[in-house]
Amino acid sequence: MLQVVVSPDAQSGFSMGELSMSGVDVTTQAVIARSVEEVVAYSANPDNAPAWYENIKSVEWKTPPPLAVGSRVAFVAHFLGKRLAYVYEVVEFDPGKRLTMRTSEGPFPMETTYTWESVSGGKTRISLRNQGFPVGFSKLMAPFMSLAIRRANRKDLIRLTELLEQK
């Protein structure tokens, strides 16, 4: 039986960043009992996103795989009761360490960064950071969006942990 521990201590489970009132800035971490190579191979592959991201419904490569700086991937998600279509462009990719993507098309500018690091016992700490600076009416929703993203990211990392640890 898998038991997920939620704690502000990233060494033992999950932690979530602070709410930014000027925008969205949410960091969520998990420690997964799998090697960095396994966690990166699965979590950095956009084709796997619908399996572990609750809100992502579809993925379409706009450039040919594999993932590299300059790759563009379209996602369709359902978030806060709305259908969102957006395209991420990979702006940084250091395999096994860091992946940063920015929206090149979508409802508002967003940047997502994954980092991975090996921790004791052959485990991996994955950190997922979402930063965005909504404009116009969306700016008024930023505090609510931050809370919703925080909840969604926590669920997503729990699902990722379950999928990888059951392998």
Stretch-by-stretch model annotation:
Residues 32-34, 79-81, 132-136:
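Beta-strand elements of well-folded, non-transmembrane domains
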